[in-house]
Amino acid sequence: MAFQDLIIQIGSLGRFQILHMIFVLICHALSAPHTLLENFTAAIPSHRCWVPILDNDTASDNGSRILSQDDLLRISIPLDSNLRPDKCRRYIQPQWHLLHLNGTFPTVTEPDTEPCVDGWVYDQSTFLSTTVTQWDLVCGSQALNSVAKFIYMTGIFIGYIMGGHLSDKFGRKLIFTCSLLKMAITETCVAFAPSFLIYCSLRFLSGIFSSTLRTNSALLILEWTSPKFQALVMALIFIASGVGQTLLGGLAFAFRNWHHLQLALSVPMFLLLIPTRWLSESARWLIMANKPQKSLKELKKAACVNRIKNSGDALTLEVVKTIMKEELEAAQTKPSPLDLFRTPNLRKRICLLSFVRFVSVMSLLGLLINIQYLSNNVFLLQCLYGVVCIPANVLGNFSMNYMGRRMTQLIFMSVLGISILAVVFLPQEMQILRVFLSTLGGAISSASITSTLVHANELVPTIIRATALGVVGIAGSAGGALSPLLMILTTYSASLPWIIYGILPFLGGLVALLLPETKNQPLPDSIQDIENKRKSSKEAKKDVVAKVTPL
């Protein structure tokens, strides 16, 4: 626990931490929209089969030129169960008799239809081009749209597996910089993908680098601040993500061609590589990696930037070694991911945190990546999601500081579940109320995820924190990967996926109550810290029982 003494000595939230925070928050604001990018780049516009009599300018048979578009559509495309033009079938021959409403040409049998063998015609009033229109991901191929999102989420899943371990082994800064570079390259290349297979492959790689980037960027801030500021830091990270969502909505409104939108969000990431040369490695990680000299250098640098007088002279290698003696001894043994499950208390924490992350991320992404199903104006709803994240996370930070981490998760997740379930049973005509509840759900989901991340960071030891957060992140990524696949269930019931999204947050909030409260508690540095705390709490309970038991 002694590292907190060093942080206080150099300034727990000074200019050094603020400059770091600004840079990392900008990175989050530009990287976060890529998770939701397919709300626009893979949007499904209105469509119908291509038919010669409608879409071939040279068609003039049977006097079709004198007929209106509605009449031509009526004789070319059958109606679906909602009495709207079918999106996936057309008549083999024009049904001229359908123009006569007086029954002069009665129909004995249903006219023969066929699939859209000549392709589709897409409505371009909202989107000029999407991946759906480029590769015809509609009708029989519509499930591929969900598969593409699943592949990206699988990349995030793999990234959490690899990123946490690599970060604990090679450091936060190196993995952060490499991930930023590779994500910028892959996302830029996505815009030029010549085929759907290459597109999915590049998005898969981008997902890997995205998760490692975000994990390490959060650690680079959190491990330089004291516990009382960590809830604020996580709230600011999600506020930055909200700014990114608002930016995405604005850019998507400006760039209706998916190639241009992809480049508008990807190319600026290359500029973020320039400030990384001044980024400092986590002094906490350097100590736990048995590199006290490098840690001392970073601590002195932080003290200098924070203008803490005389602290640089007081910080010596002997002081660092003395304060962190137990941690340095623990660092001699390199931890492995299996260490997370060897001791009972840490194992319990990891399992419970993983479940909470799984259900919270599944519901969050279910809401955020399917906004096309919730509102007619996807640009407005996306911007609203981003804007309301700011007050929601401020409220979440206030709640965590006064009610604690566990109660905050329970309350926020319950409200999220209620808002999703309410939207399910509202008719499409009540658009204003649907948008309001969807926006409320998006805001609350952001704040609930913030509280789960803060809680997770405070419950695992520094020596294996990145690996632990990676394992918990894997569970969240699994929920995120399954989230778009649930929309395939709409073929059975339009409400079924949303009912699942709405029920899961209630379960997550209840499970969060089984975890220890960490408000204003110092971060554990070693696995032994967690087990010792468990033993201390047991002994304290025994003492209480002994005092109240009559002789």
Curated annotation (Swiss-Prot):
One of its GO terms (biological process) is response to molecule of fungal origin. Keywords: Cell membrane, Glycoprotein, Ion transport, Membrane, Transmembrane, Transmembrane helix, Transport. Glycans are attached at residues 39, 56, 62, 102. GO terms for molecular function: organic anion transmembrane transporter activity; toxin transmembrane transporter activity. It is a multi-pass membrane protein. Residues 524-551 are annotated as: Disordered. Sodium-independent organic anion transporter which shows high specificity for estrone sulfate, dehydroepiandrosterone sulfate, and the mycotoxin ochratoxin A (OTA). Transport of OTA is strongly inhibited by estrone sulfate and probenecid, and to a lesser extent by 2,4-dichlorophenoxyacetic acid (2,4-D) and salicylate. Transport of estrone sulfate is inhibited by various steroid sulfate conjugates including dehydroepiandrosterone sulfate, alpha-naphthyl sulfate, beta-estradiol sulfate, 4-methylumbelliferyl sulfate and p-nitrophenyl sulfate (but not minoxidil sulfate). Belongs to the major facilitator (TC 2.A.1) superfamily. Organic cation transporter (TC 2.A.1.19) family. This is Solute carrier family 22 member 19. The lineage of its organism: Eukaryota, Metazoa, Chordata, Craniata, Vertebrata.
